[in-house]
Amino acid sequence: MTSGGHIQLFIEHTRQIATAQGDIQLALQSMQQWREAFATALKQNTFDLTGWSPQTKIANQLKQFNHKLTTHVSNWDTEWHTFSAAQSVAEVFHDRVMLLVFGKFNAGKSSLCNLLAECFRSHEQTVQYFHVQNEQIFYTESHLREGATETTAQLQGVCLGEKLILLDTPGLHSGTQKNAALTQKFIDSADGVLWLSSATSPGQVQELDALGRELKRHKPLFPVITRSDFVEEDEIDGELCTVLCNKNSEQRALQESDVLMRAKEKLHSMQVDVSLLKPPVSVSTQMAREADMNPQAMNEAGFERLFAALLALIEPALRYKQRKPAEVLLHFLQEHIIEGLRFYLQPDLEQIQQDLKQAQDDLRQLHTDLAEAVWRSVLPELPQLLEQHASTQNIDAVVNSLNEWINVAFEQQLAIQLDAYGLNLDSLSKIEKTEKMQYERIAGMVVHDGLYTTLTQQIQQAVKASTSELIDQCQAQLEQSIKHVQTLDETFIDYSAALDQLSQALRIE
């Protein structure tokens, strides 16, 4: 059985792990204050619906956005309760470092966990297997199910000694939604991640998007290339047979370099800290087992290098664990609050801004259209109105009728062209009676040619002034809402930046 130097050193080191929490109270307090201040700022920045006509497109957009915003904020407590459910696992193992064994189905996760458990047991360390079901821990004497995790809706794991936990997950790309959801739910329990992929297709780029989330959570991540072996034909006792062999060091180095390079490129494009990605190591669990895990076989199968790398991984994982309560809260603030706003509300806000700016562009044409429509509605009626009052020459009646007609015409056109706006018609310009407004008597007949000309000019001026006043009201309403969009954008940006600063302060090492 095993007695290699790095294996022994790793096991001894895990026995000395001290997992006391660091001084994170200030960080927790700062993040809670950030959350409360952000919630207050958002609630105080809902759109003012005053000035918008109910049941119109823009009014409904703003109303729906307000509802979504306030609902999103009010759900934070419920979402936090759900998000922190993974602590039911973490609290049971609060004094141990937990490494999540991560990878797609058939990556050899359970096989590797079982072999590491045997290494610990061979060094007289306690080994205890368990599985997680319905968020409860159940201990068992059985090894982890190799190749069977896909058929279960549970996580399984093993306690190695007194201070180290390996949590084996259902396949990362499990065909079972329940498995994938369970994996994601408990992923926050881990202090570091072992990313396993088979040497037949190591480090598939499409997996890195899922890994990026863990790296953004600032957990150290260690890629392990499993099944680093091959089958060759050999003649034994005169018979041709197949023999399993380790890949040579050059082959392994080539694959490891390729995985590291592609992973770094991908993570860099995802804007995550590539320093958290550790150099990959290649192993063959099967080759180690076939030689009864003797020291030479373990070394040739890559396990001396694996344990050396795990030894280097423990320190950053331990630092993560010591600040874990603050990290879990930070993850929630980043992923559910900031990202939630970005994906749930930002598209709506962008659409509102686009529609408001389009409405501004439309006002330029509406200014002309509105004035012409009112003008054409009133002017054709003027000759008949003047004839109607010719016998009495009642200028007051003429002026009052014109003002009333202009108001009615504006009301009708506003309902057609500017129905979104709650406009104030009391401030519209009116035709005022002047000395020039008189009927004339020519050859004993009452005529109104001069009066018609004067009133035509007055109608034109009143319509023009009123149209400008109404368009100005619309413009002011649009500018107010556009400014509000900008205020919300600035609020998102400012609070995101403030949270980034809290994140950096938490992770200063």
From Swiss-Prot:
GO terms for biological process: catabolic process. InterPro entries: GTP-bd, P-loop_NTPase, TRAFAC_Dynamin-like_GTPase. GO terms for molecular function: GTP binding. The keyword Lipoprotein does not apply. SUPFAM superfamilies: P-loop containing nucleoside triphosphate hydrolases (SSF52540). Keywords: Aromatic hydrocarbons catabolism. Residues 108-225 form the G domain. This is Uncharacterized protein ACIAD1444.
